[in-house]
């Protein structure tokens, strides 16, 4: 066998190994793998200094936690174009129309999906939302790096989401403290008791229970019911996902 032929064989085997690894990964693993790669690429294109020079970087932020505490509705609405579980959700209405409709309906805040590959969102969606409403905006993203928090601040977010399932306790502490140093609030998302217990710390403002299992995308409101009493009262408690009717509320 020639050296070239051997090289091709090894390349084919490496490719096969990668394909096998991807097939065994759940959707959350795939998203995080892609997200880490995406962040590194963006850091090479847009330096931190450019984000910090944004017009919105030093702008006033709104407190979602305070509004939730004093609200009649207690609702955080969401702008989402699509998802891995439901394909296309909103392909016809502009960001401006959607978020204005939410604000006029009396919601406390709006969650804006900014992941492009899996949810069809973008930071431009967050920017358009900022220009359209004057209520708190949550950047809903798979945050794994401080750079993404700087992006959130530069594009008009008031709140960031941290997902306990993809972060260690040390990472949650580092990222949440960094966000608060920029004047951003932090919503920490958990799905089970183990994630909750590893995550409780002073640098969080809100703790949410995701009713959707991010590894399988199965939904059950029982997750919120079971964990709500375990969340300390010092944190605003949020039930996330799977709420699609008045009865669910």
Could you say what each language-model-derived stretch is?
Residues 26-92:
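An N-cap/entry alpha-helix motif that binds or orients negatively charged groups
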Residues 62, 120-138, 142, 173-188, ...:
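Alpha-helix-loop-beta-strand connector modules within alpha/beta enzyme cores
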Residues 31, 77, 102, 152, ...:
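Conserved, mostly hydrophobic/aromatic
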Residues 201-249:
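Active-site/ligand-binding-proximal alpha/beta "capping" segment
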Residues 79-94, 136-144, 187-189, 238-239, ...:
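Active-site mouth loops of central-metabolism enzymes
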Residues 1-2, 6-12, 16-19:
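A cross-taxon signal for low-complexity, glycine/charged-rich
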